[in-house]
């Protein structure tokens, strides 16, 4: 269980708060809008109304006590940038800030963000791949060069074992798990025979994934 400070309760921030709550983390939610704060109260540990660009307000939250600080302010990049910078100045352990464009990400990373989330960009990429490739069932971007996909077993792999295929050496990707009837097995044995009833969880460089699985 992690302690999380979440600043900015627009649509993305609200959904993030709900997901963090479902995962069992302790969440302190902050927004300057009282209505947004009240809407999030049922699924956060605590919440406060306040201006995150005020150093005295942030200091009162004890930002260094949280494992992760999310900055998910929407519609006001200047506030997001100032908040990110102040969090780091006050000793925040790890700051994840929301960006809508690459230029915003560069400024955030230069001003204290340890990582940047692109909710719209990442969702767009997932939707583009998921709904134009019937054999791809899930897509998770790890960074600009790597991803994890859930994919149908290629026809030329069916009836053969994982060990026989020598997948990592020949194709440059790693099998993380196999999924059958909605259940995932991450204990991968070279003796597993692949067939059309399985899907594979595969990690690799985007170039290798595109080449082998036609993304």
Regions found by a protein language model. Name each.
Residues 1-215:
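Cytosolic regulatory regions of ion transport systems
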